[in-house]
Amino acid sequence: MKTFNYNRAEIKAGIVHFGVGNFHRAHLEAYTNLLLEDPSQRCWGVFGAMIMPTDGVLFNALKKDDGIYQLTTCSPSGEQDSMLIGSLVELAWGEIDSEPIIAKIASEEIKIISLTITEGGYKVDFNQSRSVFWYCLLYTSDAADE
């Protein structure tokens, strides 16, 4: 298995990402992980902001392993390639405490705030005009005003 080729203690979060699900971890984190191998790019670690009530199991699993996880890709021919991803250097779950998320967003170190919205991750009630994600944004906004 391939592993990352950098010292995680040297990595600073420059990205806050909302929605640290499978899609995010298989794409943005994988590319960020490769970028961090360049010593001049050690300011692009990811702060994972988890805001959904259902994020608890994933949050606890990632937190237990300090944000490090294994990514396995499969080629059309069936070959598998696994690597350790270390770019997720900080993690917070808004259900427990939203303050670290708000503070990180306000930090001068943060240059990018990104989010993942997938059709299966945020349930839309077509009888209503708003999705669960919209309510999470309102919740986060209300928390910032307190």
Per-region residue spans from a language model:
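Flexible phosphate/Mg2+-sensing switch loops adjacent to catalytic phosphate-binding sites
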Residues: 40-46
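Glycine- and acidic
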Residues: 10-18
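Conserved small/polar residues in nucleotide/adenosyl-binding loops
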Residues: 139-146
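Short alpha-helical segments and helix-capping/turn motifs at coil-helix boundaries
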Residues: 27-37, 94-103
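Glycine-rich nucleotide/cofactor/substrate-binding loop typically near the N-terminus or early
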Residues: 46-111, 115-128
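A glycine- and small-aliphatic-rich helix-loop capping segment at beta-alpha/alpha-beta transitions
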Residues: 34-35, 128-137
